[in-house]
Structure formats: C-alpha cells, structure tokens
Swiss-Prot record:
Subunit-structure text: Homodimer.
Domain comment, as recorded: Consists of an N-terminal non-heme diiron domain and a C-terminal flavodoxin-like domain.
Protein name per UniProt: Flavo-diiron protein FprA1
Lineage summary: Bacteria, Bacillati, Bacillota, Clostridia, Eubacteriales
E.C. number: 1.6.3.4
Organism: Clostridium acetobutylicum (strain ATCC 824 / DSM 792 / JCM 1419 / IAM 19013 / LMG 5710 / NBRC 13948 / NRRL B-527 / VKM B-1787 / 2291 / W)
InterPro entries linked: Flavodoxin/NO_synth (IPR008254), Flavodoxin_CS (IPR001226), Flavoprotein-like_sf (IPR029039), Metallo-B-lactamas (IPR001279), NADH_oxidoreductase_modular (IPR051285), ODP_dom (IPR045761), RibonucZ/Hydroxyglut_hydro (IPR036866), Rubredoxin-O_OxRdtase (IPR016440)
Amino acid sequence: MSAEKLCENVYWVGVKDQKLRVFDIIMNTKKGSTYNSYLINDDKVAIIDTVKDGFYDEFLKSIKSVIGDKKVDYIVVQHTELDHSGSMYRLIKEYPEAKVVSSKAANMYLKEIVNDEFNSLDAMEVKELNLGKNTLEFISAPNLHWPDTMFTYNKENNILFTCDVMGCHYCPDGSIKDEGGEDYLPEMRYYFDVIMSPFKKFVNMGLDKIKDLKLDMIAPSHGPVHINDIEESVKLYREWAKEKEPKEKNVQIFYITAYGNTGIMAKHLCEDINKKGVKAEVHEITDMKMEDIVELIADANGVLVGSPTINQDAVRPVWDVLSSVCPIVNRGKAAAAFGSYGWSGEGVPMMMDRLKSLKFKTPDNGLKFKFVPASKEFSEADKFVDDFIGLL
C-alpha cells in the first residue's frame, strides 16, 4: 500500500487492515477495515489523524513518499481512540517540532497516551489554520462518539474530514475512493448502530453544524471516502438518528428459569403490572436474539430481570443481557431484579448491584423468594410491583 492522491495537495496516507475480523472486542468486521489518515502537502504540512499502533512503519513510509524530507508542521487529532492515535507517540518523535491541534479534551487524553511532552494548539481557539493554498477549519463535534471529537473542513477543496462519523469497517480492495458494492451499506448501518446510535442527539447536532457547507468529499476515519454518495450518506445518518416517537408506557420483563419457579414469578409480575394499567410483556431470554432484547430495553420505560440463584450467582444468560445494555441510552429508567433461590439467594442482589451501576433507577431491594412461589410470595410481589410502578 502507498499514499493515494485525493485532489490537489491532499493525500490519503492511511493503512488497510484486511484481516481484521473483530474490532473493539464488540464488532464483527467481516470486510476488514482501514485506519484513515490524511495529509495536506502545502507550504506547511498537516496530517489529519494517525493510525493504529502496529501499522506505523507502513504509515510513515506513505507520509515520506509524499513529503520526502519536509517536516510536518501540524498533526490534527480529531479523536483520541487508539485506532486513530496509537502511533502518535512515534510520529511525534519523528517530527518533534510539529504542533498537535486538537480539542481540549483530546489534548488531555493524548497526554496520557503519548506520555511525553509535545507542542499543542487548542483547535477551538485557533479556529482555523492557513497552510498556504489550503485552509483547515475546525468544527467541534463532541460525543461523536467520544467527548473529544471534532471535524476538520478543507475550505478550498470542500473536503470534510469527519473522524468516525459516516465511517464504516469496510476495506476496499482497490482505491480508497472505491465506494463499495451491495455489501457496503449494511456495514455502514451496522457501524452506526454499534458506534453512533447511543449518541443520536449529538449526531443531529453535528449534522446541523455542517448542513451549510459545500461538500465535494467526506473523508471519514474508517472505510472509503464519500464522493458520489455524499447526499445519500448524510440523508441516511439523519434517518438513522431520528429519535423514536414516545410509545405507550411499557415494562419489559426478561427471565431465565431452571425448574420453572422464576418463570412463574415472571408471568405473575407481568399480569399484575398489566392489571394496574401499565403495559407489560414477558420474555424468556434464551428464546430471543440479544439485539432484540437490547432494542426492547431501549424502548422500555421499565425493565425487570429474573434469574434463579445457582452456585451463589445469577446465571450467565442474565449477565449476557446486563453486559449488553448501554447506560448512555437507558440511564434513569426504572429497573429491578427478581428470582427464586434455594440456599442463600445471592443472585438477586448481585443483579440489583449491576442495574444500579448501569444508572438505572431501582427500588431498595429486588424480589427474591425460596423455591416455589405461593400466595405469600405473590402478595409480596404485588407490593413490589406497586413500588416499581412508582419509579416509572
């Protein structure tokens, strides 16, 4: 791989990771990915974002193929996640006089990544840089998808460098200008759902900031650049970032059961909540896809999670659910745990602790009962429901 010219003075100097199959532990990347870095070779030289550690030698070779022995004057850091900043410490050693241009938050994070001194400029204070024939304007875009994020606009070429926004884990076989085949759009949507969907409000705010810019190219930090599909890509992001219309108040109940006892209570809780005027639905966890569970929780006003206690713990399917829930989306919602036990009953309080750590609003205690629930336990459950509904 080598540098690729995008237009006069502007080059892609990123790297391709065609063998990547899992990103950030949580994403499947069957089409690989790219770590995009861009270089403006003008009177002054600017690099926009770097690449993941492990690809530095290839990255530096691409840089030098464009600028030779010229120095780099500016390193623009739009976002400090390690796939974009992992090689920063080596690049700064190569070009120690370069000024690092970033948001204040990014500068703070970089100090803990580079662990060395570097020259820096606050992008929001300088607002723009004149490189000679090219000007870079900086646009704050916080929480897309980190607090430090910003966009960079090359005014003369009408190129918007968007960091992760409108990016995609998709490694083209040829040019970085190749916009992909039929399999590209599903990967772009998957990327949005996993990375950007918790920040829909900020997606809309970011799109509002760029709506009046003339755009001939959108250059994200992953995947191909957008040239012929700019309008469509922006439109899709608007569509995907729409907040759902408020639904009827509802409680979603998810449970796992060993001998049926936690299931009996799950169904009783569902019936009682419905009787008291709030819509409730009950689901056996192992009958569902995780993405469907996550979506139901995101659309719910309240969540109940049930598990028996086995070997002093709740069982794994419940922990799988509780490790898939996004606190950014669900904080402040009502949630509680319930379940049957035989010996000591640690499962329910352990689930309650997890719900609290996810920023759910919880009652003081969950609902736990020994073995098979009967009239006494159902009466306690009805009081539990009253308290829970009060949190909605």
